[in-house]
Amino acid sequence: MSYELPNNEKLLKWVEEVAILCEPDRIHWCDGSQEEYDELCELLVQNGTFRKLNPEKRPNSYLAWSDPIDVARVEDRTFICSLSKQDAGPTNNWMNPKEMKEKLLGLFKGCMKGRTMYVIPFSMGPLGSPIAKIGVEITDSPYVVVNMRIMTRMGKKVLDILGEQGEFVPCLHSVGAPLEQGQKDSTWPCNKEKYIVHFPEERSIWSFGSGYGGNALLGKKCLALRIASKQGKDEGWLAEHMLILGVESPTGDKTYVGAAFPSACGKTNFAMLIPPKPLQDKGWKVTTIGDDIAWIKPGPDGQVYAINPEYGYFGVAPGTNVKTNPNAMASCSANTIFTNVALTPDDDVWWEGMTDEPPAQLTDWQGNPWTPDCGRPAAHPNARFTSPASQCPSIDPDWENPKGVPMSAFIFGGRRKDTVPLVYQAFNWSNGVYLAATLGSETTAAAVGAVGNVRRDPFAMLPFCGYHMADYFGHWLQFGRSIPRPPRIFSVNWFRKDANGKFIWPGYGDNMRVLKWIVERVQGKAGAVESPLGWMPRYEDMDWDGLDMPREKFNELTSVDRDVWQNELISHEELFVKLFDRLPKEFLHMRELILSSLWRSPEHWEQIGDVHPEGWNE
C-alpha cells in the first residue's frame, strides 16, 4: 500500500472487524494505480488464473477460465433480507436478517486464511457527482480487484472524497476457500455453497462462495441496482437496469434516451447503435452514455438527469461481432479481461458468433482441445469481457458529466414474436408505467424455463429490484407526478415474426429509424396515429431511406389484434394477483381502459391507406 490509511472512523472500524472475522494473512488497501493493476494481473498469471493474451493482437489483455460450477449470477441464492418479509415482496428470496447474519458469520469465520484481504474504495458514478454513491468492497480475490478497477472509479481518490464523515456502502465478499499452510491454491477458488445477500435498511452487502461477475463485483447489480433501488425509493430517485444513449440530429440537437430490455434483447447493441448509412449521411449520430445501469434524479429545472454509475462494460461475448456491434468489438480490443471465452492457437480469443466460420482448432473455456465438429460450444454462453468504457468509439463527450444528462424518453421492450407492435408511445406517464410494469419477454436459451414462454419482467428489473415490486410500481407513478416535465414513455418490439416464422423487422442499425421517430415525437416534430394501445407512427412518419419496407409489412408490424390482446391482459392478471396487497389500484383501472379501447376499435386494428389529416378538409 502506497498511501496513508484514511481517517474515516466508521471505515477503519469495519475493516478491523472484518479482518478479525475472516483472519486473512495480510491486508492490502487498493490505491487504484496502473502499477497495482499490473502487479495483480502478474500475480493472477503466476497463480494460473490469468493467461496473458498476444500483445500484438490484444494489448494488455488477459483470459480467465472459471470453475464450471461458477459461471453466472445465482438468482436462487440471492437474498433481500429486509426487516419485514413483506418489504422484500413475493418476487425476491427473503430470510430473517438476524438468522441470515448468524449463518453468514459462521461461513465468513476464518474464510480468508492464507489469503490477502483487499480493501477497494470505489465510486459508482463520476467522482464528486451529486448523483454518485461510494462503496467499499472487501474481498480475498485479486480477480475481483482488477475487474473493479475497470468497472468502477476506485482507489485513493475515492477515499479523498469520502473524507472523515462520508457515508459508504460496505460490501463484503469472499470466495469461501481458506488455505491451510502449504496448501496449493486452485486457479479459480470458489465454494459450492453460495450466498449473495443484501440488507436494504442498513445498506450493506455480503457475498460468499462465488468469484464470478455480478456475484463478486458488488458495485454492479448488488449496489447499483438492489441497494440503490431501495435508496432511490427512500430518497426520491430511480436506479434502473437501463442503457443511456444520446441522439444527435442533423441540426446538432442532442436528445438523451434511456432503454430497458430483459436479457437477450440486444441492450448493448442498442446502446452502441450505428445508424444506417443513408441516415448517417443526413447527419444522424448515436452516442453512448452507458449500456446497463442508469441512476436518475430530478434536477432543479424540472427535468430528470441520469448518470451511468459504471466505468466499464461487463459485456456478454457470444454473438458480438463487427457486424452486430463494431463499437463493442473496438471497446474490447485492448486493456480487457476476458472470462470463459475460447483461446486461439496464437493466444487471441474467440467465441460463437465472432466470425462466420469458426477456427479449425481452439482451446475451449474448460481448457480442452476444441474443433468445429466436436458438438459443444467453445465459449460459455455467459462468457464476458470487462473493458474500459472510455475505449468505446461512440462514447458521449458528457458521459462523465457529474450533473448527468437530461432524459427526454424512456423505452421499454422485450422479445415477442407477436402481440406487441414495433413501437408505440404511451398516452401519458401512468399508462407508460403500466406498459413497463407488464413488460414480457419470451424465454430464450439464456434464461431458465421453456423456450418461447412469456416471462413477465417488470421494467427489466425482476432479478434486481431491492424491495417489493408493487411498491416499486407506486414509486414510479409518484416519481412522474412530482416532475414538471417527465420523459415520454415508449414501447418497442424488434422481434415480431411473420407467418413463416421470419423476423419482419431487420433490427440492429435499422432500429435507428424507430429511434429517430421517438426523438422527433419528443421534440413535437413527428406525426402519429392513435391506436388502441398508444400513439403509433404512420408509414409516412418513418424514414425509409435505404430500406425496402413495403407498407403491408409495416402494417403487419404495427397491427393490434383484439383476441390476442385479451389473452395478454389476462396474463397481466397473474402478475397482479401475486402483487395484489400492494399493487397501485390505478393498475386495475388502466387494464380496464385498455380492454375498453380494444373493444371500441376494430377486431384487427391496422393502419390503412395513405390518409393525411389535411385530407379530411376536402
Curated annotation (Swiss-Prot):
Polar residues bias (residue ranges): 384-393
May I ask which residue range the UniProt record assigns to the signal sequence? none
Write out the annotated subcellular location.
Cytoplasm
| Residues reported in the UniProt entry to bind substrate | R73, Y212, G213, G214, S263, N382, A383, R384
Q: Binding positions for GTP?
A: A264, C265, G266, K267, T268, N269, R384, R415, Y508, G509, D510, N511
Known pathway: Carbohydrate biosynthesis; gluconeogenesis
Its EC number is 4.1.1.32
InterPro entries attached to this UniProt entry: PEP_carboxykin_GTP_CS, PEP_carboxykinase_C, PEP_carboxykinase_GTP, PEP_carboxykinase_GTP_C, PEP_carboxykinase_GTP_N, PEP_carboxykinase_N
Asked if the keyword Mitochondrion belongs to this entry, the reply reads no
Region (Disordered) residue ranges read 375-397
Return the cofactor note field: Binds 1 Mn(2+) ion per subunit.
Superkingdom assignment: Bacteria
Example GO CC term: the record gives: cytosol
Q: Which cofactor does it need?
A: Mn(2+)
**To which protein family does this belong?**
Belongs to the phosphoenolpyruvate carboxykinase [GTP] family.
What protein is this chain from? Phosphoenolpyruvate carboxykinase [GTP]
Organism field: Geobacter sulfurreducens (strain ATCC 51573 / DSM 12127 / PCA)
Output the lineage of the source organism: Bacteria, Pseudomonadati, Thermodesulfobacteriota, Desulfuromonadia, Geobacterales
